[in-house]
Amino acid sequence: MNAVGRVAPVITPSVLGIGHGGCIAGWQKDQVMAEEHSVARKTLEDRNRASDLERVRHSCAHVMAAAVMRIWPNAQLDIGPSTNEGFYYDFDIPDHRFTPEDFPRIEEEMKKIIKENQVFQKEIRTREEVKALLEAKGQKFKLERLNDIPEGEPISTFTNGEFMDLCAGPHVMRTGNIKAFKLLRVAAAYYRGKETNPQLQRLYGTAFMKKTELEEWLQMMEEAKRRDHRKIGKEMRLFAFDEDVGPGMPLWLPKGGILIAEIEKLAMETEFAAGYERVKTPHLARENMYTTSGHLPYYADSMFPPIEMKETMADGTEKVERYYLKAMNCPHHHKIFASYPRSYRELPLRLAEYGCCYRYEQSGELFGLMRVRSLQMNDAQIYCTPEQFADEFKAVNDMYLKYFKIFGIEKFQMRFSTHDPERLGQKYVNEPELWKKTEDMVRDVLIKSGINYVEIPNEAAFYGPKIDVQVWSAIGREFTLATNQVDFAVPARFGLVYRTRDNTEATPLCIHRAPLGTHERFIGFLIEHYAGNFPLWLAPEQVRILPIGSEQMDFSEALRKRMHDDGIRVTLDCSGDKIGGKIRNAETDKVHTMFVVGHKEQEANSVALRVHGKGDQGVRPVEEVLADLKQKIAARAAD
């Protein structure tokens, strides 16, 4: 879990006339694992690193809030951070609900504020001063946020024109520095992310340095709508949701099940070749295990409520035990390591599992396959000695690169999060030598591998350095795919030890890795990445045979059976449609390859080959085309 960082004012110059500061009241969600989020205040280091674009977007959030306040003076304000996509601000307006029809009016007011070229003025104030100002404005949510700031920390406000906000930036110098923006959408958001709190209106927007960049991004968003995994998933019948099953609980339909099976097959083959051993763990466990791991009580809000069961103990007494659906696989894997004595000869020990986990995501945050409550994670824990660590970490990174090549992921970045030596024993486990050694080794692996990475200080997990893997889809949209973490704290909590060469006990290092993330998020990404046009090896329906007339049906059925027996996913169009209609249907269904069979093809034991999106590929002998298909499938070739 991320810990709350201390914040202080900071002055950061920029060639763009960028302002200074660091947001105090704004909280953001930082992804610490695939599908795992925690809330943390931005630190001083975060503010220093803020990019020019982040500053423009944060400033634009203030301009939007100022415009809303001009139009609806009774609006209550909560938070307004920048995001990867742009920015948002949370409002409570008792007598008005935002709709897209409001956007032109708000945007017009924002343009006026930008034209006024207002200065973003930062002031350091006392707690009493800020409280009085917020009380005078009747801003109840801001008053609660003020209480979050620890005693003794500087409190700053930013003012532009008549608008004042409890904030420490960062901002541009003037509203006129904002050159291109657009409001995007409105959504419901619970105050502080808790469903028991009031529901606010979250107004989203985006901003860019240039109008041309905004136009390009908007075009990309239009393409993203066309590639929306929820839309394509429904059209292709890959997955479904049902109210009786529950929100965030995807039902994988047969074609979606094929995607899962193919991805798991790839993972199992890759992991077997790399020396992993497969394990299987239960879907729930007793409370005590998660207390030992440290997930309880700190992660309790993201776990489903406990199940209480009355059990008869060995001595005949009855006891109520509390069980939790597992939100992560690692504690179970630690128990497998501890199931019998271990020797250095067994290390590295690599335990892998596509484990089912359950996260209690807020209903308002659920989003298709990207944010779910039931998920299957490509998880593994690697237990090793310090001497083995560098080779193991490199092997994990090599596995990522292999997967990226197979799935045609050309743009990616690894974000290497390190610790702050001054916060050892507070935010981070107090093992200075291990921190230095593991961070140096991780850094060395990244450099020698030539991997594109950025180093982010003071963002490591409490138990060790970590790498968050960002990937970009074919249309340039960024996704968080997976994580790779070093753990030299939790194994000790579980008492994990092995016998060394000197016959003494030592605690192993542990590498958590999930290179394919979860089925849900990864397949959601792949649907957009490929626009549903999966490569041959992954396509749910690899081949569809299209006989022109009934005279070709026996030949086509014999061909279908032969291909099916060879392990090819093939179907036969037995409809009475004309061949043009059959081709259109196959294209609409995103069937990868089509075999058109007419009288001439039947006589010559050949097929007229078509490939989805590429059209006619000519007439080819059956033996030749089948050999080609099988070779491409076996090689997991990209199209």
Regions from the PLM with identified roles:
Residues 4, 29-76, 84, 90-639:
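NTP/phosphate- and nucleic-acid-binding module
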Residues 6-9:
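Intrinsic, low-complexity polybasic segments
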Residues 80:
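N-terminal single-stranded DNA-binding subdomain of primase/primase-helicase replication proteins
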